[in-house]
């Protein structure tokens, strides 16, 4: 049953020709061969399996034996079969989905219908196998047991041979049943895995088709691709099973009516009544799950945001606020999960309850009508109802699967019908033109009413293009462009860019500048096709490269981030590294360019991240370069080097669009655009704009005046000229040196780093298969979390009471029949009949009837109580584990987050929490019900027919050998599946964060290919795990079939001293046990596998080492500390993690109260590490920091961090409102908030928003520009009113004007504070009292800026000269 041949999938696109039957099912037909002696050595052994091997899972035996002898790893398991792969199945599902959309439209399209078409052939084959299984299952209990029990009553020797033949027939039917059931599951598992990989790939491809994600959150994406795809996997497994129930009902009803009479219909009716009840409960469960999932999405999204922004949260000591938020969401989620759990638990309890009610009702009615009842008839009916019970027992699985699948399909359809808007970017007609915008008005939102069709819109664009081309290519002044605001129709969204018109010819450099929020980044986004075009034309030619304002770095090494899928060329690569100023950085890294980078580049500085992003663009060697402020995060010297060597030289001949706040670079641009409020304010060459003396000229004069004409300092013209001359001399020396090298035939890049072999896992700690093995500590932790041992014991007792009541009712019936036979029994034509009429007349036997009915009521009562208590207990456990793990992670140091991928943590809080909340309780409940039933069956059989225990003991050795192999193998397979899931999660998260970059470089296919590879790897291990469960189940079934055969022989050949009811009871129970025991062991193993999630959570609880939240030493801290803000470093050394180099080495410096200190130095010199040290995000290796003469290591972390304020390099905004982002703790009034917004020049911007302070902030603050985000962060800092302020390049994303205003605000607002300013633009530190110059983690200069500037050979003077030289 292999399915579609991957090499024939392409034929599916040929809609005109249907493939022949042989073409479509060739691999499946080969599998139908009973045995295939000549193996083709396929990548996966299942593809070489014949029918017998496929049905019995024998192809898996080598893997199970290997798992027993050796530890399994991701690399040692065979890959997923090509027929089950993402690539093959996603293509096929995509075609079916496209056909559905084309046929009925997106609104009426049914994803469920498409899923049915995708797998209907395999489902029908599965149903056929299940029907054959059901026929065999019904044949044994209904016909053969009845015949055996009838022959048992006849002691004549002539019947012994017939009895033995009946026993052999019973063994044959049971064995055939087992074989067909195994075949059905073998088909089902491959069907389910194909559906899972196909749907998840289709979802990911659709999400990746968007250039920006605004319609779905990151949390929802993770939930859909993990939990929802698994829900569809389970649905494909269990949904076909109920199709056999009607056939079973008919067979059992007919035969029961035949042997018992019309009263048998009572029991059948009971089953039929409960089926619609289960359907109603399924709908109810679906509604509760739908509500719970929406809250789960919110929790996962908030958790993802928390983990992404953990550094800022720790610095601001906001952990408690976020913990309260997530705990509140979790409480809401738990309430909804409780309701779904009650319904689900009721569904699980229905099988034993319905069976007991049906049997008791049938026999009570039969006896009440004074009809004759014999032991063979009674126990044949019981055996038959037990077969029906197993069929009903699968309904909870199917009902749960349908309920969750319906929710999942609805969520998936919502994603699939959301189509990315058509590209509005056209090709310029002039081959010399690379970029052209003609009266382009763009918005971030889609228009509400699109009255024009696509063709009409395209025609209009062409018309506008032709009409305005002559005007654009002329030398006319464009001063009138972009002034008038476009008229918009009612219902159209607000435009962000208005009437933008400009042309960029091939090989030209266009500089774009403007204030914060003027639309610079939006213009880059417009050129990338990420916005919505309302009118006008946007045309671009040639492949492009894009450097985003906030660098996107993925988990891998430096080289992988630079190459980004391109082939490695040594010379080109070395040149790229040189021109991007990365040589020294790579030489300082432990493994050079093979050094592993954490997620989002956590172990790199902002400047290093930005230059790696730039190197990626340079190495790509594209025709068009869109650079969104790439030089703000680097110091002046590196900035000059990058601009000169990279942008002016390496990219010479390329077309470059450079957005920058560093106006000194604009002089070298061929053309400059000044944006204001989304419109072009001025446009022309630098010289032309300076001559016009407009806004641009004023900005440039302000910049120069700010840098060199400040009356407070001594920077005069002579000094500037001196600095220029010294810099020019250094540049000339460098040129001469490089010339000498060229004369000698050497490469100009002399500092070429050497390739070295790096270990695979340097930073990110990998999950090993040994981690997560379930130990007793896990069960202990779970039991304590659920309320303790007493609560767990009481819950366990409820299971035994419920199932004990069910088993008791059957035993009591046998006792009743024995009692009746003692009163009056007579042989009647080869059977013993009891005259129940006379039995009922005896008052003693009224008690039997009452107790029999009471047993039914007790099953019902205990079932209801069990459902409520078990649901509450398991949810208490999962919530307790969630909160404990979250609290542990929150209190972990930053080194933990540096070495633990966010994807792995999100795996814990999404998929693993789903396992603990929903799947573990479901499997555990079924296991406990089955286990308690097995115990009572064994007890009753031991009492009524002890010889059975001898048979079971004889096969116990084989059973334990099988269990030992199975248990080891299934545990390891589950571990490997868990481990392979984390990289998959990380790739999803990283891809969603880097959509813009992925599209710009046209790497969507590479990203999808990697997703498919990771998806296939995880799905392969999931398939192996599930197949291992069935491998064991089949072999257990065969062992129990042997036991059933032996017991049937013993019943046939046993002494007459054993009553007929005892024999009937034993035979009906051994048939029940033969199926129940393997189900019990398998469900127990699945439950233990689900406990792996609890083990992984426990590991975090036990291994996460908290930060030193309390002080190291005993010390007293004044109440108003710090009152002055004096900071002293004494021989301070710091490293980020053990066995890593020092990042701060022997710092000794004193900063007086109220001083402003500018911290400068090359990228990676240790500037940002100073902030980490002050906030104790990293504990010192040695040395001390004193604030107001108090050792900060003697102060609690929360107290320390609340007294300091940090404005980070990368602005961080949270999903919520503007007010929440400014004041998460809600401790300030609106007036105070408006006041700080006014001081940071954001009041007008917020006032324009409809809901003002309550205005929505989207994920990552995407509805604000980077500069606006930074200003909001500045406002947030002003509210804290701290004595010590650290600005980590806080104004890097601001234009010079806003920067100047903000600097004056900082000077005024923090005039009594100690302010440390880390900056790359030196104008931000020239007014500081002191300048601290750092290099390689050491202080190389610390003095007044004017003193350092007067020394031409000082490091600060060199940096200043580099900026002046620009």
From Swiss-Prot:
SMART domains: AAA (SM00382). Residues 123-404, 792-1089 form the ABC transmembrane type-1 domain. ATP 1 binds at residues 514-521. It is a multi-pass membrane protein. CDD domains: ABC_6TM_MRP5_8_9_D1, ABC_6TM_MRP5_8_9_D2, ABCC_MRP_domain1, ABCC_MRP_domain2. Glycans are attached at residues 439, 837, 978. SUPFAM superfamilies: ABC transporter transmembrane region, P-loop containing nucleoside triphosphate hydrolases. Residues 478-702, 1127-1361 form the ABC transporter domain. This is ATP-binding cassette sub-family C member 12. It comes from Rattus norvegicus.
